[in-house]
Swiss-Prot record:
Domain of life of the source: Bacteria
Cofactor note as given: Binds 1 Mg(2+) ion per subunit.
Any matching Pfam family: PGM_PMM_II
Catalytic activity: alpha-D-glucosamine 1-phosphate = D-glucosamine 6-phosphate
Free-text description of this protein's post-translational modifications in UniProt: Activated by phosphorylation.
Active-site annotation: S101 (phosphoserine intermediate)
Gene3D superfamilies per the UniProt record, alphabetical: Alpha-D-Glucose-1,6-Bisphosphate, subunit A, domain 3, Alpha-D-phosphohexomutase, C-terminal domain
SUPFAM superfamilies noted in UniProt: Phosphoglucomutase, C-terminal domain (SSF55957), Phosphoglucomutase, first 3 domains (SSF53738)
A GO term, aspect molecular function: magnesium ion binding
The protein's name: Phosphoglucosamine mutase
Length: 451
């Protein structure tokens, strides 16, 4: 059944247009009703990033939860993984993160976590969505049973201590010059503080949120500012988080950007040497580079691929017993510690590897040469276009031409009327020709507007 509100990662859209106070309140009411089982008092934990619209959505959700008798604990600006961690820690029934991740400030969203700290399943999101269209007035609490709301003191310190405990107590970051870019987002206080407490010399940028500048020319999707600062202070490493701090990219001492594929390769190799991999392999998505797969194979590890989205990666990890997975974009999931992607915790694992090996970041984190990869978007009606015979023939011909020396991934976007066409292979010119041919066929099918 097609869903009206929930997408690939919760609910996301334009603030005060798609994401209105009314919708936020209804989501909280529906979620509160769903999670109120048993006679004890129930509670929700709410965190947010630094967008201006976060205040509006936060208070609307407080009204929703308390109206159905659920108490609310307000964390303020906190990373998404901190909300996931604090939900079970505070014995809450549900956790909420108000964020649109790497999107600009005009957007916002709602991510929901269960009492175990994991994102809700598709089935539970469908239940919540079904309740949105029903009359929740039948479930409203009596005046004496309304919920209470309060700010939680010390939540940031608790998360900082959690991140530090992912490293051995004897490990210090003393001697490392680190630039941390917090994207003017949710990690702007906790990330620099955690690195400083671990002994590093810290230079922080993207730590002056004003409600409007989240992800603006900073963060993991805009690394130019980080590269500049690394050169300026002659840092050993640069670390960039996104707006809700659940993804990370690295910049080495030479100012070169290192993506999630390279980070997974480095951590996998390091954990393999230490005997820490739960299985001889990792989990990544269809979009991860073929070079990663070849590198892992060369050291005796496998790569299990899933559909795009950190949720799919985590589901496969849990189902098959992996403890390392992620996405090229920098979502790195370390399930020994976290129930979701955690940019800071992943960065700490890289830093621990750098300290253990005693080598520059460029040597520690560059494990393979990426295969040339080309990604283009075509604005079309995906359902109609991908079913047309001509489009199918062009795609099949592309697969035939690449053979074992490359890959094609053609998939509809989960959030907009776009088909994403990704091709990779050893012959860049051939890949580009194949991708262009597929885009041309899609545009000729049912074009909206080519990008």
């Amino acid at each position: 059944m097609a869903r009206k509100h929930f997408g690939t990662d919760g609910i996301r859209g334009r603030a005060n247009a798609a994401i209105t106070p009314e919708l936020a309140m209804k989501v909280a009411q529906a979620t509160g009703v769903l999670f109120q089982r048993g006679e004890q008092r129930h509670r929700a934990v709410i965190g947010k990033d630094t967008r201006l619209s976060g205040y509006m959505i936060e208070y609307a959700m407080v009204a929703g939860f308390t109206s159905v008798g659920m108490d609310v604990l307000l964390l303020g600006p906190m990373p998404t993984p901190a909300v996931a961690m604090l939900t079970p820690s505070m014995r809450a029934d549900v956790g909420v993160m108000i964020s649109a991740s790497h999107n600009p400030y005009e957007d916002n969203g709602i991510k929901l976590f269960g009492p175990d700290g994991f994102k809700l399943s598709d089935e539970m999101e469908a239940e919540i969505e079904a309740k949105l269209d029903r009359d929740v007035a039948l479930k409203l609490s009596k005046p004496a049973d309304l919920g209470r709301a309060k700010r939680v003191e010390g939540a940031q310190a608790r998360y900082i201590e959690f991140t530090k405990r992912t490293l051995t107590r004897s490990l210090s970051l003393e001697g490392l010059r680190i630039v941390i870019d917090c994207a003017n987002g949710a990690g702007y206080k906790v990330a620099p503080e955690a690195l400083w407490e671990l002994g590093a010399e810290v230079f922080a940028i993207g730590t002056e949120p004003d409600g409007f500048n989240i992800n603006r020319d900073v963060g993991s999707t805009a690394p130019a500012a980080l590269v500049k600062k690394v050169h300026e202070v002659r840092a050993d490493i640069g670390i960039a988080l996104d707006g809700d701090a659940d993804r990370v990219i690295i910049v080495d001492e030479n100012g070169k950007v290192i993506d999630g594929d390279q980070l997974m390769a480095a951590i996998a190799a390091g954990w393999q040497e230490e005997g820490r991999l739960a299985r001889p392999g990792i989990v990544a998505t269809l979009m991860s580079n073929l070079g990663l797969e070849r590198y892992l194979e060369s050291i005796g590890l496998t790569l299990a691929r899933t559909a795009v989205g950190d949720r799919h990666v985590l589901e496969h990890m849990r189902a098959h017993g992996y403890n390392l997975g992620g996405e090229q974009s920098g979502h790195i999931i370390l399930s020994d510690y976290c129930t979701t992607g955690d940019g800071l915790v992943a960065a700490l694992q890289v830093l621990a590897l750098v300290k253990r090996l005693g080598k520059p970041v460029s040597q520690v984190c560059r494990r393979f040469d990426p295969v040339p990869q080309i990604l283009k978007n075509v604005r079309v009606n995906a359902a109609q276009s991908l079913e047309q015979d001509h489009v199918k023939r062009v795609i099949e011909e592309g697969h035939r031409k690449l053979g074992k020396n490359g890959r094609l991934v053609i998939r509809p976007s989960g959030t907009e009327p776009v088909v994403r066409v990704m091709g990779e292979g050893d012959n860049r010119d051939l890949v580009e020709t194949i991708v262009d041919d597929i885009c041309e066929a899609l545009n000729a099918a049912t074009p909206l507007a080519a990008e």
